[in-house]
């Protein structure tokens, strides 16, 4: 969640300069979120999500950006990722110097989540800005993000390898690239990840179903896809437990199928919960067989948050304290002019 969107296929990078293609599978470790900064983040996020359905309401987000900025400056990596996504993709929100702010935020993120920051650097370079770079550096950052354990980078590499393979004639090299692509899809959705790639899990599940006829893998990777927030994982599991995937010979289970249908319907129709939405709690809702089904009230954690009451507004004393600790203006969350503490991390401020 909250990772850069892959660029269009024609803009994607080349693997020509990579010394090796495979990686040693690892994952990124997420530090605990600071509690005080989290109160700012949750307050901003609730209002943010409630402005996303209509572009005409996005301007209402502006007063809440300061909470994201101050939270990010105080080590809240989720606020950092959400804010970078807003700066990159939400043109409906009028934010001056959005590119420089995004770069500064990513420099800060690199101190906590270096693999995620590398993925953002790769995307920034493809869009024409970011760190000083040479041709091919977008691919280098993407590769390093995967080496450092970012599952979305692994998924994007799988897509890149697949794109290269389908352009080749039938033969050994085409098969090699397709096999390697399949491996990276599985890497991206491996159980090692806290936030597996939703799209990567979906592709791995499709391969396990259509090509390998492996029911255990098909269900596992679809569950990982859903854990990563992709409604497509729930759709696949609904079909499997309805008995529609004949290649798998899975015993139909209507209650499991129904729960997956409820989940997929919510995620598909409630697009405003993205990019933050994940379903980390999926095993507490619909564990895979043979585990029995627990009681469930029919709602996801993100759904309870969005539909629940507005989080308490953070006290101005707390906002001012956290802002002062990082040399920020509490009214905007931007660095105060001529503050060396601000320049340490927000290098675009003049």
Locate the predicted segments by residue.
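TPR/TPR-like (Sel1-like) alpha-helical repeat modules
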Residues: 176-186, 219-232, 238-270
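Structural signature of tandem alpha-helical TPR/SEL1-like repeats
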Residues: 56-66, 94-105, 131-141, 168-184, ...
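Short helix-capping/linker turns of helical repeat alpha-solenoids
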Residues: 33-40, 48-50, 74-78, 83, ...
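Alpha-helical solenoid scaffolds that mediate protein-protein interactions
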Residues: 64, 71, 86, 108-109, ...
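N-terminal leader/linker segments that initiate helical-solenoid repeat arrays
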Residues: 1-63, 74, 346-350
